[in-house]
Amino acid sequence: MWILFSPSEKKCLEHKKAYQAKEETFYRDFICNIGLDEALKAYIGILQGGKESEIKQMFGVKNIDLEELAAAQNLMQSPLLPAVLRYIGVAFSALDFEHLESYARDYLNEHLLIFSNLFGLLRAEDKIPYYDLKQGEGFERGLVEFNTRKFYAKNTKNIWEYLIKQQKESLEILDLRAGFYQKCFDLSKIPITLKINELLVYEPNFIKNGKVVSHYAKHYRGILLRMCAKEELKCLQDLSSLYMEGLELESMQTIQDKKIKRIVLTYAIKSK
């Protein structure tokens, strides 16, 4: 069983658990390794020698923080931190990984996969340096043209092989990703060369006053992930009985499409 999660724009610059890499190829064992080396070198090259306007566009900012820029410029030598701690946006604040019991942290290290827009698919405990790249923003240097969606396309086979390597018959996935990352890696497009008897995908929606919420959904995805970890959820069917403060499961809709069974869970946000 896997839980798929989005990264966050906001990242931790300094952390007491960060440590210096012993070698530059910290990404050697990453799942998405096709084209990663040249992409990172191009990324660093632009930050070190590119125009200020180009860097602002890559970062998605009006003003560049020099400390953050310096860390990203020296990405290969910057201190490393587990991905689940590097990201500190709304969803990760709700998850509050550091204050979970050790068993819950172990659960996430085993089941959580984070879709980075630069490094590709990351395990929760994969160590990454500080970096910045606005969602959906690409870059080009020399012969290298980086685009997040194209990068995932190159690594699709690697990702599927990783997802199914520990599965026996069916594959269960809780998809907590934002729409952009769902498009980067489409669960409905299973390569015909891979043997999967059934793919079971659970996908939550959050509504308030009858309307689907978008921004607040980040927070509640983090809450849902936290509760899965605290309860050590082994089977996604158990989501139907999982209690979450502030949320009420309103409906579960099943959509069958060939080998894919998609279960859409609609949670109502209760007024305080």
Model region roles, listed by residue range:
Residues 1-3:
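Extreme N-terminal starter segment of soluble prokaryotic enzymes
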Residues 97-272:
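Internal, well-folded beta-alpha domain core
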Residues 5-99:
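Active-site helix-to-loop segments that bind/position phosphate- or nucleotide-bearing substrates
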